[in-house]
Amino acid sequence: MFSFFYRFNWNFIKWNLVDNTVSLTQHKIYLASKKSDIFLVKNKQRRFFKSFYAHIFSVRNCFEKFPSLQSYFYSSKDKFFLVSLLSSKRNLFLHGFFYNIKKAFLFYSYDFFLLYKLSFSLLLTSTLLPYINDINPCFIKDYYFFVEGNFFDFEQILIDVFKYSYYFKVENFKFLYFARFSWIYKNFPLDVNFLKNFLDRKNLVFFKSLFLIIFNFIFNGLNFFFQENFFISYKVYYLFYIDKFYFFFKFPYDFFICKKIIISFFSLRGIILNININSFYRFETFVFNFFIFDFLRFGSNILLHINKKHIQFYKLSLKMIVKMFLKKSVFFLVNLLNKKILDCLNRGFFCFNNNFLFLELDLYLYRLLWRYIKKLHSRKTRTWIYSKYWKFFSGIWRFFITDIKTGNFLFLKSHLYSSKYFYSYRNMKFKISNTLNIFNLYNKGKLERMIFEKFKYKFSPNFIVLYNNQRGLCFFCKKSIYSNRFVILNIKKWNFSFFENLILIHFYCNNFNQLQ
């Protein structure tokens, strides 16, 4: 068998012929599924699953869709060897060699088990995907093993789901333990012996791609079942995570209809639900827990409550970037931190206390940078470090660095003031004050007073004379004037000079009763 592979070169294959053959076969399977001819679909899919075109198509896509698998590292012999093992006679997964596969291929210099697993996943995908109409993005993690050429964004799922006002959930929903496997054996278009080896509870192997395909196969046709039997016009949305099943609907009187639909639909699939569903929840009053997040709808916005573990994990990642950074290039470090901050903000986190949360993250990041810069310039004073790395820009103290080699300058991005964070799903933007101080919030008054002392000479000469005569204090409240919101009053005492008739007060102290 190995001598046969030496005669061929992987690069000389006519891939146009392979792509056209695979596309034509998938289109025939799709047309047969529209006619509801199950036996014809199973016959075509079994032939396509055993064909040489499907095997070589899956191995090629394995290298293209996973860039970490460098194609030049594998020879043509290795790739054709994978193609031969995907055949029905030599397929390791079809014959149940789940536990001995790693031991059998330990002598290979590359991770053969991972490569074979990905190729087999894509083979199942290309074979079964044309038959499944309702592709439900229930499994967010590792879903790319199943859906070929499609990526379901988690934010887009939330946008669609949160259009609905109510939901109910079914817990401890393990369909592999509730299902009667006879329905799956009869309708699932794969070898029966292979399914028996996989679905056997004694030898159950959690092979993710096949698990997802069986799941979507069981739920296939749920939307059509709704619209045909119960005359519901809107689309059905449901999510499935581990052992929890969530179902979403618009109106409260649809709850009993949806409950009846689910029980009758699953009974046709051989799944008997013995769980009582007696209550439903509203998004505005009950938190929707999915994955490790808690969601709540507030008006037109989706609010996300970020738990403490999430914040601690993100802080730890920032700390590891700063602490494990071995180079002395602060410019490169700030660039890495900016990418990390953008990656965090692009997730679209929404919570009630977003200002306090992101202010806390900014302060934590500035403390990390202060310790790093202090170690980098151990002989320099604090004043020198502040003047070199922190600049007052647009009313905010920001970390600033200049690259000496290229002359480029870079500001450290902020969690709180980043424009990419303040958005909603309806493009509603939020505005915040530019006078807030992030770096030293407790000395905000001293900072404003210092800035005022620096720029007070740019005002009119009359103001400077009054300011110096009153020693920078208001005439009434005797508090400092370090704001541009002040008033100059003429008390009209003709016995005095011109400047003695004028007083400088705060705008809120402008009470003429106090002049009497």
UniProtKB/Swiss-Prot annotation:
Q: Which InterPro entries match?
A: RVT_N
Q: Cite any additional comment in the entry.
A: The protein migrates at 80 kDa in SDS-PAGE gels.
Alphabetical list of Pfam families matching this protein:
RVT_N
- State the similarity comment: Belongs to the roaA family.
Q: Which organism is it from?
A: Euglena gracilis
A GO cellular component entry from the record: chloroplast
Subcellular location(s) per record: Plastid, Chloroplast
Q: Which residues form a coiled coil?
A: none
Q: Which UniProt keyword terms apply here?
A: Chloroplast, Plastid
Q: Which named protein is this? A: Ribosomal operon-associated A protein
